[in-house]
Amino acid sequence: PKNMTHATFRDLGFAARPDGTFDVYSAGGLGNNPRFGVLVAQAVAPEKILYYIKAMWLTFRAYGNYENRGKARTRYMQEVCGGPEGYAKAYQEKLAEVLASGEDLDIHPEAPVYEKQGDGVVVAGPRVLEQKQPGLYTVSWHPLGGQPAVETLCALSDAIAGMEAVEMRLAPDETAYIINLTGAEAQK
């Protein structure tokens, strides 16, 4: 799947799969000595995600560097554990502890039901994405510097306030996605 969230270079990244599950990457990061995350799990059900988050927390508590602030990053744990394979093994051990603990960390997310229909207006542009729902669009917005003025956010809020089922979602790279827009709404 397309790595839209850059899951492979995060402390803990989840890459969505077409079947509705996630691949989990751990101990990646940018900055000095950048590293891709290690694939630690495949096809994880959405309701089981918190087990993987807790395993990451326990792994960092066990192998993270608390002495040197410059190395207090998850990507350095790959070195500490002897490389990506050693890190994957250490992570799996912590995951096994979490799963064996009996703690119920299952979540039950409900998939939203969208009844909104397109209006027949077709739009295209570098920031316009077609949604899987026919006739609906997403507009991506990446504010320069990542910090829009309050007035800009208020204007955006005013613009979408009267639009049915329109939401704004934020991505880790500071991009905002305004979703569930009809063609006419996307043009605004």
Regions found by a protein language model. Give the residues of each.
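Peripheral terminal and linker regions in Fe-S/redox and tRNA-modifying enzymes
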Residues: 1-188
